[in-house]
Curated annotation (Swiss-Prot):
Sections of the chain in a coiled coil: none
Composition bias type Basic and acidic residues, residue spans: 1-12
NCBIfam families: nst
Primary location class: Golgi
Function according to Swiss-Prot or TrEMBL: Involved in the import of GDP-mannose from the cytoplasm into the Golgi lumen.
Region (Disordered): 1-28
Membrane topology, as annotated: Multi-pass membrane protein
Organism: Phaeosphaeria nodorum (strain SN15 / ATCC MYA-4574 / FGSC 10173) (Glume blotch fungus)
Transmembrane segments: 37-57, 68-88, 108-126, 131-153, 162-184, 200-220, 243-263, 275-295, 304-324, 328-348
Subunit details: Homooligomer.
Lumenal membrane side: 58-67, 127-130, 185-199, 264-274, 325-327
Biological process (GO), any one: GDP-mannose transmembrane transport
Name recorded for this polypeptide: GDP-mannose transporter
Keywords assigned: Cytoplasmic vesicle, Endoplasmic reticulum, Golgi apparatus, Membrane, Sugar transport, Transmembrane, Transmembrane helix, Transport
């Protein structure tokens, strides 16, 4: 473009008495198109919270059956549903992930074993404990992961993070105390029903301790292995679920009772279709959690995502009070509140820690993939 042409662009011609100019067209501002639903941060956050609640409630519904004991079979059904769902999505061109590779499967197989340990112990803990207590105690996994990062990845724990850990421990103590007091007040101090309720709770706490250790080990190991395999979101989901199917199926056949009498107990005729449908929905919810987690990470900031992870504990705990008639006492509500505050304090502490300028190599805050985040959040439920 020449200089004369540029000057013409900024020149204003004065109208001549001998000539007339046509009126200039009225310039209207361009209308902005409304943002699509997939770019809406609020929709992503609500979908993420809803999928977390859906998975917790459906699992609790199946596991809270009086005689349900086919936990390996439940996990196998969930894995089959998940692999089927993402395979259909890949065939439809909605998502992409790597094709099965034997060498990659061998590298990832130990992670799948740890995943089985984490989910299996979690099912027994969720069976014996109420959803609010389970959610509160799940916070203790964060403490183990934090100190695991200190040992394995050279991480650090700030004073504010340490304060949030103290609140997490306090909320767990309050929840256990409230649970025990409710059992004693409901059934009497020395009654057989009270002793049975206490033994059930103690079994739940023991399974919860195993679950916290397994969860921390799984997540730390997966973080290390993802760096070696360079897996993306759906790669991790695909291999995690595909490799666990044969293990869970064999474990169910060898360990669990498949007699006709036990099948009748696990799937009573009047509830059989409902239980099977809920098992399938719980498998689909794992896909929903992974997708909505990745969606929330994409359309929100890391700060918002961290805060959503903390705030998500409250509706999950409340869902246990609403859907499963968990005891609503001063102690249980206080435990939920303290656990909720501890999550917020922890999220703020991590945001502040990550916002500090890094003067050394970034070995302390290597981000997890969205799939590992979604798996960790779904099991905090």
């Amino acid at each position: 473009m020449s200089d004369d042409k540029k000057s013409d662009d900024y020149r204003v011609d004065m109208p001549s008495s001998r000539t007339s100019r046509a009126p200039s067209p009225i310039m209207r501002p361009a209308l902005k198109s409304a943002p699509s639903l997939t770019e809406n941060p609020m929709a992503a956050v609500l979908a993420y919270c809803a999928s977390s609640i859906l998975m917790t409630v459906t699992n609790k519904y199946v596991l809270s059956g009086v005689d349900f004991n086919l936990n390996f079979f439940l996990l196998c059904v969930q894995s089959v549903v998940c692999v089927t769902a993402i395979s259909i999505c890949k065939a439809a061109g909605l998502i992409t992930y790597r094709d099965f590779n034997t060498d990659e499967a061998k590298k990832w197989f130990p992670i799948s074993l740890l995943l089985i340990g984490m989910i299996y112990t979690g099912t027994w803990a969720l069976k014996y404990l109420s959803i609010p207590v389970y959610t509160i105690f799940k916070n203790l996994t964060i403490i183990l992961i934090a100190y695991g990062e200190v040992l394995w990845f050279g991480g650090s724990v700030t004073p504010m993070t340490l304060f949030s850990f103290g609140l997490m421990v306090l909320s767990s103590i309050i929840a256990a105390w409230a649970d025990i007091q409710h059992a004693l007040n409901s059934f009497g101090q020395q009654s057989e029903a009270a002793n049975e309720a206490l033994s059930t709770m103690h079994a739940g706490y023991l399974w919860m301790a195993f679950n916290c250790v397994c969860s921390a080990t799984y997540l730390l190991s997966m973080r290390k292995r993802i760096k070696l395999t360079n897996f993306k979101d759906y790669d991790t989901m695909y291999y995690n679920n595909l490799l666990t199917i044969p293990i869970l199926l064999v474990a169910s056949i060898l360990v669990e009772d498949w007699s006709s009498a036990n099948i009748q107990k696990n799937f009573p005729p009047e509830q059989r279709n409902t239980v099977i449908m809920v098992m399938v929905i719980s498998g689909m919810s794992t896909v929903f959690i992974s997708y909505t987690s990745a969606w929330a990470v994409r359309v929100t900031s890391s700060t918002t995502y961290s805060m959503v992870g903390a705030l998500n504990k409250l509706p999950i705990a409340i869902s246990g009070l609403v859907f499963f008639d968990a005891p609503v006492t001063f102690g249980s509500v206080s435990a939920i509140f303290v656990g909720f505050v501890s999550g917020i304090v922890y999220a703020v502490a991590k945001v502040r820690q990550n916002s500090k300028p890094k003067t050394v190599l970034p070995t302390t805050n290597i981000p997890l993939s969205a799939s590992s985040r979604s798996m960790q959040d779904s099991l905090k439920a």
